[in-house]
């Protein structure tokens, strides 16, 4: 498929800073992959001097595959395509000495972070889960805004902020002592390093001579600063973004970063991609008219050559049960009449709690469905167990990982033994693993617990020595040496479950082997690099799934970003739901409108909205108003369902069940042919 004029211009402009305003479905990934090919083939850039950065592993993998298909593996070798956090990790791995760190650092995931902060804040924060989560978010926001603990303390206003800043200082000191980083450090540390160290900054500016950034509207303060530091005064970069799809301000994203670009880089070239290759003209008209109610610095209007398309429907329901019943009935009928696949349908909602009643009706009618936000491969207990072992092998200072593995499988090392070991280690400023080898420890510990601990740590030290010479053999010996398979069969609910879990362990081992050996496209990695890469993938892939089965997709509007479906149901189109009540209270309607815009532009062929006349909220019955966003849409393109005569709940239930029963009978007859 040939590039359209806007895409062609975006690909060929390489002489200065470039902002590509890419509307929904406008083919931005094609632009990025073609631009990389143009830089290498047409402009003389070497692949190793080009970096492309995006926000999810899935997007990075897709980009890598497309570039590989366009250029071939040999030409693309050395090209850096990754997420922001993986790029940050690469900088830290190469510059650990300048950061005052040891090379064998490891990464904390959110479970480790929560456990550590719970321990550190004992006596400072009552056992309050909500307050603890607020502390985690506050520390994350401080790091995203490039604030160190001392700066956070200096700018603290009020008692709560002062306590939080103190906790941040304790947390930061503990991470440094354990040679551990958390997720936000992967951007914070490289950014501060490049700000403060001219030699390192010049080295990376020379290494990355052209930078491409996708989903730029999702960048936060530290990511924007990192981009500026990497491109320097040369300013050879392309950022691709859409201010109308900025929906992550709650996690630090700043859509104003798009506007700041033109101030920081006055020579900025702005190129708009307005042709949409996804949706019908009618769907785009609705999206354009809705989003026009937001203030804009950059005006754009999406258009399509895919035809005007079907009218948009608005279905009214008596309550949430009726809403789910109606959507399920409509979906079954549409599927039967149009001979579609279930994966062609998406049910999108504002909050996760809205999914339950839809699950109930889909399940009752044996409709296969999938809720996005499932368990990442790397979040599975057996994978986290093995990664914890590897974290201790590569970073003996990682107490969090040590405590996870010390009794997995069971080794009769009891809590009293671990408590004494922890106290011994703390007084000597050592990690628990390192302290376990101290000669004097036998005076504090004795008996079976001490013997079991010594056996375990000496065995692990042997594996550690082998890992330095033969990492693949070491991991194989580790899995066999702890007899993990037997442990899985003992602790899993069924032999089948144990078999599946062991299959996951073998899959991880297979991936590790590939990464340690390297490939045509990727250099061989060290065991430390492999472990940190896997830990990072777990943190970034929560909710991502590679499987694409024939299932109706249920997901939040936030989770739907970047996806497309032929038939979309946007449910709960009421004031208080979309826009969300907290946004109404805080007068932050613009972002909620962008969220509705994202939902509308997921639909390719047909779009149906639903709303309820009554809903139960916090045990009370409320009668919500229709969403203002429905009223902002072009009414000529909407079919509002006509009011029907009021029927009792019993009659409606009987009628609905009868309708669904008829549809199921038709489907059963069809299957029986």
Swiss-Prot record:
One of its GO terms (biological process) is DNA replication, synthesis of primer. It catalyses: Couples ATP hydrolysis with the unwinding of duplex DNA by translocating in the 3'-5' direction; ATP + H2O = ADP + phosphate + H(+). Keywords: ATP-binding, DNA replication, DNA-binding, Helicase, Hydrolase, Isomerase, Nucleotide-binding. The keyword DNA-binding applies. Residues 281-562 form the UvrD-like helicase C-terminal domain. Binding to DNA induces dimerization, which is required for DNA helicase activity. Helicase activity is stimulated by PriC. The lineage of its organism: Bacteria, Pseudomonadati, Pseudomonadota, Gammaproteobacteria, Enterobacterales. InterPro entries: DExx_box_DNA_helicase_dom_sf, DNA_helicase_UvrD-like_C, DNA_helicase_UvrD/REP, Helicase_Rep, P-loop_NTPase, UvrD-like_ATP-bd. Rep helicase is a single-stranded (ss)DNA-dependent ATPase involved in DNA replication; it can initiate unwinding at a nick in the DNA. It binds to ssDNA and acts in a progressive fashion along the DNA in the 3' to 5' direction. Binds double-stranded (ds)DNA with a 5' ss- but not 3' ss-extension and forked structures with either lagging or leading ssDNA. Part of the PriC-Rep pathway for restart of stalled replication forks, which reloads the DnaB replicative helicase on sites other than the origin of replication. Belongs to the helicase family. UvrD subfamily. It comes from the Bacteria. This is ATP-dependent DNA helicase Rep. GO terms for molecular function: 3'-5' DNA helicase activity; ATP binding; ATP hydrolysis activity; DNA helicase activity; protein homodimerization activity; single-stranded DNA binding. It is an enzyme of class 5 (isomerase).
């Amino acid at each position: 498929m040939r590039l359209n004029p806007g895409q062609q211009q975006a690909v060929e402009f390489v002489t200065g800073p470039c902002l590509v305003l890419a509307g929904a479905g406008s083919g931005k990934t094609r632009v990025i992959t073609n631009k990389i090919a143009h830089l290498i083939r047409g402009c003389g850039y070497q692949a190793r001097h080009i970096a492309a950065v995006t926000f999810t592993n899935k997007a990075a993998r897709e980009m890598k595959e497309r570039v590989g298909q366009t250029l071939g593996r040999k030409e693309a070798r050395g090209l850096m395509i990754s997420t922001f956090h993986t790029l940050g990790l690469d900088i830290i791995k190469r510059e650990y000495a300048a950061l005052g760190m040891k090379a064998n650092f490891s990464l904390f995931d959110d479970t480790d972070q929560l456990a550590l902060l719970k321990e550190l804040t004992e006596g400072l924060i009552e056992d309050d889960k909500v307050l603890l989560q607020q502390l985690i978010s506050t520390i994350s926001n401080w790091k995203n805004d490039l604030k160190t603990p001392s700066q956070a303390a200096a700018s603290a206003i009020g008692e709560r902020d002062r306590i939080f800043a103190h906790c941040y200082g304790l947390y930061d000191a503990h991470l440094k002592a354990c040679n551990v980083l958390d997720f936000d450090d992967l951007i914070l540390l490289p950014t501060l390093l490049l700000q403060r160290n001219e030699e390192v900054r010049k080295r990376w500016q020379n290494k990355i001579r052209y930078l491409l950034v996708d989903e730029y509207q999702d960048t936060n303060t530290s990511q924007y600063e990192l981009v500026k530091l990497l491109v320097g005064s040369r300013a050879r970069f392309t950022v691709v973004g859409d201010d109308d799809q900025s929906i992550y301000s709650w996690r630090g994203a700043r859509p104003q970063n798009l506007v700041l670009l033109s101030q920081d880089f006055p020579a900025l070239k702005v190129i708009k991609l307005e042709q949409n290759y996804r949706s019908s003209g009618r769907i785009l008209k609705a999206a354009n008219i809705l989003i026009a109610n937001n203030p804009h610095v950059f005006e754009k209007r999406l258009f399509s050559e895919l035809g005007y398309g079907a009218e948009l429907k608005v279905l009214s329901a008596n309550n949430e049960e009726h809403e789910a019943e109606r959507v399920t009935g409509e979906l079954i009928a549409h599927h039967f009449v149009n001979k579609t696949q279930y994966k062609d349908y998406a049910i999108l909602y504002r909050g996760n709690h809205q999914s339950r009643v839809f699950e109930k009706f889909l399940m009752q009618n044996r409709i296969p469905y999938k809720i996005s936000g499932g368990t990442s491969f790397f979040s599975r207990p057996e994978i986290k167990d093995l990664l914890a072992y590897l974290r201790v092998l590569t970073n003996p200072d990682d107490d969090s990982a040590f405590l996870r593995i010390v009794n997995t499988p069971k080794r009769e090392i009891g809590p009293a033994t671990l408590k004494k070991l922890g106290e011994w280690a703390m007084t000597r400023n050592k990690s628990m693993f390192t302290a376990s080898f101290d000669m004097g420890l036998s005076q504090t510990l004795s008996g079976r617990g001490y013997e079991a601990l010594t056996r375990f740590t000496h065995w692990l030290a042997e594996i550690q020595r082998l890992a330095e010479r033969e990492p693949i053999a070491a991991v194989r010996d580790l899995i066999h040496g702890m007899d993990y398979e037997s442990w899985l069969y003992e602790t899993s609910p069924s032999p089948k479950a144990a078999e599946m879990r062991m299959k996951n362990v073998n899959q991880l081992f297979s991936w590790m082997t590939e990464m340690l050996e390297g490939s045509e496209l990727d250099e061989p990695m060290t065991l430390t690099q492999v472990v940190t890469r896997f830990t990072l993938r777990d943190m970034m892939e929560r909710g991502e799934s590679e499987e694409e089965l024939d299932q109706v997709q249920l997901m939040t509007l936030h989770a739907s970003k970047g996806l497309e479906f032929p038939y979309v149901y946007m449910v709960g189109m009421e004031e208080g739901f979309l826009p969300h009540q907290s946004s109404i209270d805080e007068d932050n309607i613009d972002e909620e409108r962008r969220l509705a815009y994202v939902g509308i532009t997921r639909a390719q062929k047909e779009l149906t909205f639903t709303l309820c006349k009554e809903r139960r909220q916090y045990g009370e019955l409320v009668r919500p108003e229709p969403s203002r966003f429905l009223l902002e849409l072009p009414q000529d393109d909407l079919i509002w369902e006509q009011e029907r005569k009021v029927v009792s709940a019993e009659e409606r239930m009987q009628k609905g069940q009868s309708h669904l029963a008829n549809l199921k009978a038709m489907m059963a007859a069809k299957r029986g042919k």
